[in-house]
UniProtKB/Swiss-Prot annotation:
UniProt name for this protein: C-type lectin lectoxin-Lio3
Annotated source species: Erythrolamprus poecilogyrus (Water snake)
Motif Mannose-binding: chain residues: 117-119
Disulphides: C27-C38, C55-C154, C129-C146
Domain of life according to the entry: Eukaryota
Annotated Gene Ontology cellular component terms: extracellular region
Length: 161
């Protein structure tokens, strides 16, 4: 009986320890998890509209990433700065020409920002898309011309979220 209890406890401990392996099992292959979302960096250079379209085609409910809090900003910065440090990266923030303020791809209002110093400046009235800046380690944001070609980061909901 003692041996049975000991073996049962051992198997239980093993099961719990293995449950943490493959923690991104709720994300598609090649995507990394954070909170209830999955993210993927695309290293093809596209303009903002092409990047958004690629995100939508890549995954159901896919879109350019929304950075809605400091925790997500830091997580993405840490993940991205470990891989790339010379190209800015499109994410999902864009200036609504009709409404005159910044919106996420799903149309929701911005409640958290991390603009770089002096940004957004809408330089020459031609900057209505946002990018994570390489110079800041992908932590701060810069408004840019939507037609420029950059890497981009997509987001989708995790299967468990």
């Amino acid at each position: 009986m003692r041996r049975f209890i000991f073996m049962s406890l051992g198997l239980l401990v093993l099961a719990f320890s293995l449950s943490g392996i493959g923690a991104n099992q709720n994300c598609p292959s090649g995507w990394f998890p954070h909170n209830i979302s999955c993210y993927k960096l695309f290293t093809e250079r596209k303009n903002w509209d092409q990047a958004q379209r690629t995100c939508m085609e890549e995954q159901e409910n896919g879109q350019l990433a929304s950075i809605t809090d400091a925790d997500t900003a830091v997580k993405l910065s840490n993940k991205l700065s470990g891989n790339w440090n010379f190209f800015d990266i499109w994410f999902g923030l864009s200036l609504s020409k009709t409404r005159g303020f910044w919106l996420w791809p799903d149309g929701s209002m911005v409640t958290f920002t991390n603009w770089g110093k002096g940004e957004p400046n809408n330089f020459w009235d031609m900057e209505s898309c946002a990018a994570l800046t390489a110079a800041s380690g992908y932590l701060s944001w810069n408004d840019k011309n939507c037609g420029l070609l950059h890497y981009f980061i997509c987001q989708t909901q995790s299967r468990g979220g």
